[in-house]
Amino acid sequence: SYYHRAYEYDQGHLEGMLGLGRQLLRHEDLEASFKIYQNIQLQHLDRLYGEQAREVFFNAGVIKQRLGDRMRALDYFEKALDYDPEHKESINALLENYEATKEWDRYIDLTRQLLAVEQDPKIRFAKLSQIGDIYAEQIQDPGMAVQSYLEALSLEEQSVIILRKLLNLYTNTRQWVEAVDMLNRLIDLEPDDGKKSRFAYTIGVIYRDEVHDWQASVDAFDKALDADCHQLKAFEAIDRILTERKQWKELERAYRRMLKRVAEFKEEEKMGSLYMMLWQNLGEIYRSRLGHMQSAIQAYEMAASLSP
């Protein structure tokens, strides 16, 4: 070939050596190609400018990688980056190696290096999400995982996947205010009423058991019932909280709201029985808790009219 002839004519000619090294590498003559790149380093290193030096070290790294010498390959890829810090092929080659060797800190540093020059928001989102996964699952640093996921979320604010990952991290680290924020955002994005209700119920449990804010808890359980009145454990929770705190007027209002919700479904066997029981219990609240006898009578009469 032309490069072979040029090399035979002048074994120190830089352009000829570079061309021959490339050609041999393309033809998988790895040992011969590596020898050329070694000779370039010995003869011309002080004359190589950035792009040429990067090519020499990157290709030497590719050869060593294919020959199974991972450590030497890493050294060459790192040297290639010294001459061209934004060279994506060198960075990706290093990322592949650091992932295989589980050198996660270096992997993240290099990914951040790619992000510094990456403009595509979808690629940025994917890489930030990946960094978050590494911090969460490999390094087990929830704080840094949260930081990375929040960066990703700033690019795709409606990413349910990232919101759920943040919810899990906030829950595991007992950051309840932040967990509630994630749940509220999930509610806003969720089209299914049953799932909305379950998210709201979870908020109620957090306020009740972790934050110890009974009013916020009742409000959240109410939202769960507004989304799906079949979520009966939410109403049971409201009943229990308000009864324990002797909030009788609030309890009466809660029963009134529940009656209004259930009325729409009272033809269902289960909900019909519940509808009757709600009127009966409301009558008892009026009678024994609020002392409103006339209202109690009316509620009892309504319950009696529904009795089969």
Model regions: which residues?
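Repeat-based scaffolding regions
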Residues: S1-P308
